[in-house]
């Protein structure tokens, strides 16, 4: 596994110089960098969770599986502190480039946690159309006291593509989160 090259003159393989330069865990011995070979374990770990999710909910589409995985991924605190301590757009771009969407929490993927609930819907939305969803949010969510509250929304879709254009995506999605008296009142405001 990993990157190798076949040297024809000597009839052997070569790995030196083909790896990725990374920090060395044994930097105390005076070698701060080392060459690492192979591939990340992130892809097979996420694929394993995705396969378990597909087995548990076989009616899910691949887009719903992607959305559930993405919504339960988080950046490790140490990564956020070192790559985005200023909490700005450039730091978030750095995090995305270096560690993607973060680690997927397998526990939250399969069952709601004490302080976290996952609601999902799968639907087809026509072009230039809207779809409204009503989220039942308990009164405790709005309760008094200083604490962080969050509603996370994840959208996943397979866009129509235009292969003859540089901007190949034909579809764009957006959402608006609205607190209203009823679904009917919100629908009237958007139509």
Residue ranges of predicted features:
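Noncatalytic accessory or regulatory domains flanking protease catalytic cores in secreted, cell-surface
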Residues: 186-191
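Structural signal for hydrophobic packing residues in well-ordered secondary-structure cores
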Residues: 1-8, 54-57, 73-77
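Short, small-residue alpha-helix embedded
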Residues: 42-56
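Secreted peptidase-domain scaffold signal
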Residues: 90-180
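Extracellular S/T/G-rich loop segment that most often corresponds to the catalytic His/Ser-adjacent loop
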Residues: 1-39, 43
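Active/binding-pocket-proximal capping segment
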Residues: 11-23, 66-72, 168-181
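Core alpha/beta structural scaffold of self-assembling particle/tube/pore-forming proteins
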Residues: 61, 85-87, 140-141
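An often Trp-containing, charged/polar helix-loop segment at the C-terminal end
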Residues: 57-83
């Amino acid at each position: 596994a990993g990157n190798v090259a076949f040297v024809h003159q000597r009839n052997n393989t070569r790995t030196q110089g083909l790896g990725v330069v990374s920090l060395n865990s044994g930097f105390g011995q005076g070698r701060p960098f080392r060459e690492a070979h192979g591939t990340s374990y992130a892809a097979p770990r996420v694929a394993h969770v995705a396969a378990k999710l597909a087995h548990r909910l076989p009616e899910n589409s691949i887009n719903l599986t992607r959305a559930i995985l993405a919504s339960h991924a988080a950046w490790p605190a140490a990564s956020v502190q070192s790559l985005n301590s200023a909490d700005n757009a450039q730091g978030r771009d750095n995090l995305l480039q270096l560690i993607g969407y973060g680690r997927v929490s397998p526990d939250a993927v399969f069952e709601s946690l004490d302080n976290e609930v996952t609601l999902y819907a799968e639907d087809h939305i026509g072009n230039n159309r809207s779809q409204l969803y009503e989220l039942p949010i308990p009164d405790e969510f709005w309760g008094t006291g200083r604490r962080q509250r969050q509603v996370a929304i994840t959208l996943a879709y397979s866009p129509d593509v235009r292969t003859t254009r540089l901007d190949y995506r034909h579809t764009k999605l957006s959402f608006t989160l609205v607190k209203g008296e009823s679904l009917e009142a919100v629908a009237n405001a958007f139509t």
